[in-house]
Amino acid sequence: MGSSEQELVAIARDLGCGSYFLGTFDKRFPGFMAPNKLACAIVNTAGRETGGVHWLALAWNPKSHTCYLFDPFGFSDERLKQIYQFEYEGLLKRSALASTPDHCITLVKSTQTVQGPFSAACGLFCCMFLHAFIHWPSNPMEQNPTMDLLTGVPNSMLQSPQVEPTLRRNQERLYRFLTQHSPYFRRHRERIEKATAFDQMKNAQVLFHNKIFY
């Protein structure tokens, strides 16, 4: 279920991330080691030995000394720690970003939900965000042609039936976007869509979803 590392790397390459894309990592991501270079990565909240749990995207814009953290669920810092035991403060501290002249980093984090609670498409949404970052590094979260295809809802409404049509439409637009921009996705579309379906996690006994709801 969900996206494999190989799939995400192939799709990110198709989307033009090129040498700026550092790859996929587990929760031990060492951080951005070149403070003067535009860079991005897809990071899992769990260790690789677990098979993975949830994908996030991280990006660094050296021009503005800004680090972007994109979570398709838009969880708060506290919820990320509670649900996934994932903390990004340590990640930033152990990276080379602290070596910037003024030791000052701006963190911009997504706060709205674009992915349905039972969807397994978190990695694909991360790829979409990285496309926005590479093309519009000063405003990758919003107000660009890529991310404006999606409609965010308050994270507090993640489980609300009221927003299900919006989140389902987001996933349909995600698939359409990847079909247009990624030859790899087009070749493997049926398999990828099945593995990342909007209701993929609904009947699965997956720990992190239990934590989300309970």
UniProtKB/Swiss-Prot annotation:
Domain of life of the native organism: Viruses
UniProt-listed InterPro entries: Papain-like_cys_pep_sf, Peptidase_C5
Residues annotated as catalytic: H54, D71, C122
Gene3D superfamilies, A to Z: Adenoviral Proteinase, Chain A (3.40.395.10)
Record-level GO cellular component terms: host cell nucleus; virion component
Primary residence: virion
Site feature Cleavage, where: G51, G52
Keyword Disulfide bond (UniProt): yes
Gene Ontology MF annotations: cysteine-type endopeptidase activity; DNA binding
Catalyzed reactions: Cleaves proteins of the adenovirus and its host cell at two consensus sites: -Yaa-Xaa-Gly-Gly-|-Xaa- and -Yaa-Xaa-Gly-Xaa-|-Gly- (in which Yaa is Met, Ile or Leu, and Xaa is any amino acid)
Main EC class the enzyme belongs to: hydrolase
Compartments reported by the entry: Virion; Host nucleus
UniProt family annotation: Belongs to the peptidase C5 family.
Further facts: All late proteins expressed from the major late promoter are produced by alternative splicing and alternative polyadenylation of the same gene giving rise to non-overlapping ORFs. A leader sequence is present in the N-terminus of all these mRNAs and is recognized by the viral shutoff protein to provide expression although conventional translation via ribosome scanning from the cap has been shut off in the host cell.
HAMAP family per record: ADV_PRO
Subunit and partners: Interacts with protease cofactor pVI-C; this interaction is necessary for protease activation.
Name of the molecule in the record: Protease
Annotated source species: Human adenovirus F serotype 41
Lineage, opening ranks: Viruses, Varidnaviria, Bamfordvirae, Preplasmiviricota, Tectiliviricetes
